[in-house]
C-alpha cells in the first residue's frame, strides 16, 4: 500500500484540470479555456489498485506582474515543496521552453512529464516532441504521452506515479473523490458557469464568494456573491432583465445538484469591488480561506 501527494504543474491551460477529471472520471477540478481558471489548489483523490494518490491542481505557471498572478504563481511554487512527486503537464503542441522555465525553479522532488493532448496529433509529431524532451532526460523520471479523452492512457500514468510514492497508510477515506471542501467545489462550479456563459466577452475579472450554505436532507441552499471590478462588468454578468445571471445560475445549479445528489436552491448576487485583483489582503483570503 502506497499513499502520497502529487502536485500538478504546468503552463496555464496545459490541460491540468482536465487531466485530473479524466483520472477521477468525475468533474472535480475547474475546467475552462480561460487562463488561470484554477485559482485554488484542488485536492483530488485517485485510488489506483491498492494505492492512494492525492493530486493537487495548482494555478498555471506564467509570467505577469499583476498582484493576483504573482500570488497564483507563489501558490503553485509552494505546492511543489509540499508534495512527494511533481507531475509536469505540457501539451504536445507546446515548446519545451515552458519545461525549461519549470526547471529554473529548481524542483527538489522527483518529477514526471505528462505530454498531454496526444490524441490531437499524429505519431510523427509525437515522436518529434519526445525527441525534443530527450535532452532533458537527466532531470525527469519519465515522460508519458497522455490523452484525457482516452481511458487507455490512464493506467500507464498512474503506474508510473506510484513508483515514486512511499509506503504509507491512506491519508483520506478511499471513498472520497476530493479532500477539498464541498463549499470550494460549489464555488468552482459557479465560476465555471460564468466562463461558459460569457466566454471572451468578460475579461478575467470575476471571483465567487459563497457566504451562506444550508444543507438539509432533501435541499441544499446556497447564497453566493459574484465579485467583479466595474459596473459595466456587473451589467454583463446580470444581462438584460437578469437573463445572463439566471442562465449562469441554472447551469451552476445543475452541476452542484449532480455533485450533491439533491435539489439545489442557488441565489446569486453581483458586487462591484474595484481593483480587487490588486488587493493583496482580499486575494489572500480568496486563496487561503478554504485550504
Swiss-Prot record:
The keyword Electron transport does not apply. Keywords: Cell inner membrane, Cell membrane, Cytoplasm, GTP-binding, Membrane, Nucleotide-binding, Ribosome biogenesis, RNA-binding, rRNA-binding. It is found in: Cytoplasm; Cell inner membrane. It is a peripheral membrane protein. GO terms for biological process: ribosomal small subunit assembly. Residues 116-119 are annotated as: G4. One of its GO terms (molecular function) is ribosomal small subunit binding. Residues 10-17 are annotated as: G1. Disulfide bonds: none annotated. One of its GO terms (cellular component) is cytosol. Residues 146-148 are annotated as: G5. It comes from the Bacteria. SUPFAM superfamilies: P-loop containing nucleoside triphosphate hydrolases, Prokaryotic type KH domain (KH-domain type II). Its main location: cytoplasm. Residues 36-40 are annotated as: G2. Residues 57-60 are annotated as: G3. Residues 186-274 form the KH type-2 domain. It holds the Pfam family KH_2. Residues 2-167 form the Era-type G domain. Monomer. Belongs to the TRAFAC class TrmE-Era-EngA-EngB-Septin-like GTPase superfamily. Era GTPase family. An essential GTPase that binds both GDP and GTP, with rapid nucleotide exchange. Plays a role in 16S rRNA processing and 30S ribosomal subunit biogenesis and possibly also in cell cycle regulation and energy metabolism. This is GTPase Era. It comes from Campylobacter jejuni subsp. jejuni serotype O:6 (strain 81116 / NCTC 11828). The gene is era.
Amino acid at each position: 500500500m502506497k499513499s502520497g501527494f502529487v502536485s500538478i504543474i504546468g503552463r496555464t491551460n496545459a490541460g491540468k484540470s482536465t487531466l485530473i477529471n479524466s483520472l477521477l472520471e468525475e468533474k472535480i477540478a475547474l475546467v475552462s479555456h480561460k487562463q488561470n481558471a484554477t485559482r485554488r489548489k484542488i485536492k483530488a483523490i485517485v485510488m489506483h489498485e491498492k494505492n492512494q494518490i492525492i493530486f493537487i491542481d495548482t494555478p498555471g505557471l506564467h509570467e505577469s506582474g499583476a498582484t493576483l498572478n504573482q500570488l497564483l504563481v507563489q501558490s503553485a511554487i509552494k505546492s511543489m515543496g509540499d508534495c512527494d512527486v511533481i507531475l509536469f503537464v505540457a501539451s504536445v503542441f507546446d515548446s519545451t521552453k515552458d519545461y525549461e522555465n519549470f526547471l529554473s525553479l529548481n524542483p527538489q522532488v522527483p518529477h514526471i512529464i505528462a505530454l498531454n493532448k496526444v490524441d490531437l496529433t499524429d505519431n510523427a509529431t509525437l515522436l518529434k516532441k519526445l525527441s525534443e524532451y530527450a535532452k532533458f532526460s537527466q532531470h525527469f523520471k519519465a515522460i508519458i504521452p497522455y490523452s484525457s479523452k482516452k481511458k487507455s492512457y490512464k493506467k500507464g500514468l498512474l503506474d508510473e506515479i506510484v513508483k515514486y510514492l512511499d509506503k504509507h497508510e491512506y491519508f483520506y477515506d478511499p471513498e472520497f473523490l476530493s479532500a477539498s471542501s464541498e463549499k470550494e467545489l460549489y464555488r468552482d462550479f459557479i465560476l465555471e458557469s460564468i466562463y461558459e456563459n460569457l466566454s471572451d466577452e468578460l475579461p478575467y475579472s470575476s471571483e465567487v464568494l459563497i457566504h451562506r450554505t444550508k444543507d438539509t436532507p432533501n435541499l441544499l441552499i446556497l447564497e453566493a456573491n459574484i465579485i467583479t471590478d466595474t459596473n459595466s462588468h456587473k451589467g454583463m454578468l446580470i444581462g438584460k432583465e437578469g437573463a445572463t445571471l439566471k442562465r449562469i445560475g441554472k447551469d451552476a445549479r445543475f452541476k452542484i445538484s449532480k455533485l450533491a445528489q439533491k435539489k439545489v436552491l442557488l441565489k446569486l448576487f453581483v458586487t462591484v469591488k474595484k481593483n480587487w485583483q490588486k488587493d493583496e489582503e482580499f486575494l489572500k483570503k480568496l486563496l487561503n480561506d478554504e485550504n
